[in-house]
Amino acid sequence: MSRVSQARSLGKYFLLVDNMLVVLGFFVVFPLISIRFVDQMGWAALMVGIALGLRQLVQQGLGIFGGAIADRFGAKPMIVTGMLMRAGGFAAMAVAHEPWVLWLSCILSGLGGTLFDPPRAALVVKLVRPHQRGRFFSLLMMQDSAGAVIGALLGSWLLQYDFRLVCSAGAALFIACAAFNAWYLPAWKLSTVKTPVREGLGRVLRDKRFVTYVLTLTGYYMLAVQVMLMLPIMVNDIAGSPAAVKWMYAIEATISLTLLYPIARWSEKRYRLEHRLMAGLLVMTLAMLPIGMTSSLQQLFTLICLFYIGSIIAEPARETLGASLADARARGSYMGFSRLGLAFGGALGYAGGGWLFDAGKAVGQPELPWLMLGAIGFITFLALWWQFSPKRSASGMLEPRT
């Protein structure tokens, strides 16, 4: 085995260990924020939605800058610093008794993610060959699902005693992850050339095909982020206990671990990436529409199953398509900008979803936020259909980079 092949192989194992630590640290805390502050402390869902939206907007909206800086200085210092900042955000969240404290803790957590997320994504593109990326992204998603369940179980158990224990566990995991990266991550450069920050930013912004694709995904993310806000609230409302939320993540893990990789392998040989993305989005949209009209936990979990199936169809295709459109001369910048759709969609999905949830309850129409999300899903589907139409593809606008 050549040194390059050996480095790629070891690098992939490193990425899997690193990803598991990050997922565990995240899911110990974030799925329980809405339970803690809406159900236990009686805050309006809008207040918590703003906090979650701020984290999403800061982390993903500023990701292009984090990626551009990583292109210039390398991945390691950005990743280690960002993970320590995320740990600090969790520590601040532990003492949040006013909305503004929660907002500040989420902003700090988001700033940490701004630093570590784009270079981590760029390392995947650097270390995994193009023909292997779809399968590797599927493995990461399976790991995400398993980590989400383990993290949510640990967080739910700790929440019985004290929310400060939940935040302490999340902070400890991110400190451990920072130490792991500081000790084992080589001083790899992300791009094929040492790109100045301004040049990397400009290269992305001039790439119309990539910008169009990223911004179109805003609507997709508005649906996807509800697994952190409205779906846990719905499960808690119908079940009458926050402990039921862990079963939502258990469903996700079961579906991902049993179906994600086989579906990805089967579909990558038969369908284009954009068609898989659109099919998954359509399934997610159809699952969202009737959620507000459900009255039993069995009905809700059935729709959540359908939503997760749509997600495992769409996510590997979305990640692979975004990576294939990136320019190797500015990988960090491209991966940072690719998070902008998540920034806008997350902020709108959290804050708008929280506001619609409160409004629907106030006027006696709990189905209102879900119908609106369904409409957004259909609009996004049509936008992707237009963007990837044969005529536009033939023009070369959306042909993947080699």
From Swiss-Prot:
Disulfide bonds: none annotated. Keywords: Cell inner membrane, Cell membrane, Membrane, Transmembrane, Transmembrane helix, Transport. PROSITE patterns: MFS. It is a multi-pass membrane protein. The keyword Cytoplasm does not apply. The chain crosses the membrane at residues 13-33, 34-54, 99-116, 139-159, 165-185, 214-234, 243-263, 277-297, 300-320, 340-360, 368-388. GO terms for molecular function: transmembrane transporter activity. InterPro entries: MFS, MFS_dom, MFS_trans_sf, MFS_Transporters, Multidrug-R_MdtH. This is Multidrug resistance protein MdtH. It comes from Klebsiella pneumoniae (strain 342). The gene is mdtH.
